[in-house]
């Protein structure tokens, strides 16, 4: 039955729950003297069996999906989640983000692309790589 269900209803429902949860922690102390929201950005690769998940090829005999997460450190609530195939490079996620003015983005060097980081700067946000 799940194969025929549209996955977008679950994505929309998840976003509604995330929005409610972030409101609950909006006033929580972060432990840092920063006025803006602090986000951590990273991804994880989930290995899958290629014979069971042929739609997610990663290597010759392996399948994988990547979960890219933008985590609001106040409350440790995901603010943005994107699923991709395992081959999709992390830096591409910066093209999907809508930068928040005054926010701080902490990310590893997989997101190091000067044009994309400059777009964060132009939006009035800050980043640490």
Tell where the protein language model's regions lie, with residue ranges.
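Conserved, well-structured functional cores that handle cations and Mg-NTP chemistry
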Residues: 1-129
């Amino acid at each position: 039955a799940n194969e025929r269900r549209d996955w977008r209803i679950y994505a929309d429902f998840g976003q509604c729950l995330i929005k409610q949860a972030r409101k609950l922690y909006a006033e929580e102390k972060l432990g840092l003297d920063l006025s803006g929201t602090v986000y951590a950005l990273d991804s994880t690769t989930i290995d899958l069996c290629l014979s069971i998940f042929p739609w997610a090829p990663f290597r010759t005999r392996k399948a994988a999906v990547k979960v890219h997460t933008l985590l609001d450190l106040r409350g440790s609530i995901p603010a943005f989640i994107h699923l991709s195939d395992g081959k999709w490079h992390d830096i591409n996620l910066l093209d999907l983000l809508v930068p928040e003015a005054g926010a701080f983005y902490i990310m590893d060097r997989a997101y190091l692309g000067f044009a994309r980081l400059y777009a964060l700067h132009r939006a009035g946000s800050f980043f640490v790589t």
